[in-house]
Amino acid sequence: MVGGAPEQRQLFLQPFLATKGAPLAAFALTEPGGSANVGSPSPGEGVRTTARRVGDSWVISGRKQWISAATGWNGEGADLLTVVCRTDANVEPSRGISIIAVPRPDSGLIFEHAFDTLGHRTHLMPRFRFDAVPVPAGNLLGQEGRGLQLAAESFAGSAALVGIFGVALMRAAFQFALSFAKSDRRGGIHQIIQHQAVGYALADAKTTIEAARALSWHACRALDTAAPGALELAIHAKVFGSEAAVRVITNLMQVVGVDSYGHELPLAGLLQDAMALPLFAGGNIGVRRRQLHALMLDPAYDDLATLDGICLAENVP
C-alpha cells in the first residue's frame, strides 16, 4: 500500500493476506473526462472528486469510472477502494490532492453504468459515484496533499505490470500460431511453416516477445531494488510491451489467415484484450509518453541511469 503507515497496512491489508475469502481492491483515479489531466489546477477540471473534512471524518463526493474491480464480486463494491480526491481546492494539485482508503461503505456508493468493453470482459469497469460517503480521518494515506506523488509511485509499478500483460498475450498468440503453422497446410502439400514468409513472421514475433520480456523483467527488478532508472524503465516497458502486443498479435493473425478473425480460434480474443493495454494504466499518448518527455526535459536527466543494476549472467541470484 503506497503511502500507508504500518498500522494502516495492518488494518487494510490483513483481509488480503488471510487464507479465506477473495477480497478485491481497486485504485480509483480516473473520472469522466479522462485521467491525463489529473494535475489540472482548476477545480472544474482534472480531479473533481472532493473530500471535505467534517470533524473526525472525510466526506467524499464525486464520480469515478474505468476503475478495474470496483464493483467487487457481487456488484456491491470492492472490499477496499483507494480514492484520489481533492482535499483542498484552493491550492494547486501538487498540494491539494490526497488519497484516502475507503472500505466498502454501507451506503453512498452508487454504481451508475457498466461499460460494454471490447475486451477484458471478465470484470466490470464501471462508472460510479460517492454520495457524501464518510470515512475516518485516519484513512488518509500519507500526508494530505501528496496524492499526485503517491499516485505516480503507484503507476510506476502498474506500468511494468502492463508490460508483462503484453508479454503474456503475445506468448499465448505465438504458441497458437506456431502450432497452427506446424500442423496446417491450408490446402497445400506442405505445412505453412515451410513457407519463408510465415517463418519470418514467426521469427519477428518471437524477437519482439523476447525484447518485451527482457525489458519488463529489467523494469520490475529495478523497481524492486529502487534503482535510479526504475521509473523510466517501467514506462518503457508499458509503452513498448502494450503496443508490441497489438502489433504482434495482428501479424500472427495474418499467419493463420481469415479464420483467426472468428472467435472459434483464440487470436481475436487475445487481440481484443491487447487493445486495452495502450489505453489503460495511463494512456501511452496522454500520460506515458508525456512522462518520458518530462524526464528527458529535466536538466539532471541521465540517459544511462537505466543501466544501473543491470544483471550480468554470472551475478544472477
What does each of the following model-derived ranges do?
Residues Q65-G72, G157-V162, L277-N284:
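Glycine-rich phosphate/pyrophosphate-binding beta-alpha loops
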Residues F111-E210:
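Glycine-rich beta->alpha junctions and the first turn(s) of the following alpha-helix
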Residues V256-P317:
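Glycine-rich phosphate/cofactor-binding loops in nucleotide/flavin-utilizing enzymes
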Residues P23-R53:
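A gly/ser-rich beta-alpha-beta helix-loop segment of oxidoreductase catalytic cores
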Residues M1-L11, S35-G39:
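N-terminal glycine-rich flavin-associated loop
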Residues R63-L109:
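A short core secondary-structure module
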Residues K182, R186, H190, K206-F240, ...:
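C-terminal helix-coil-helix/basic helical segment that borders enzyme active sites and/or dimer interfaces
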Residues K20, V167, R171-F174, L202-S216, ...:
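Alpha-helical transition-metal enzyme core signature, strongest for iron centers
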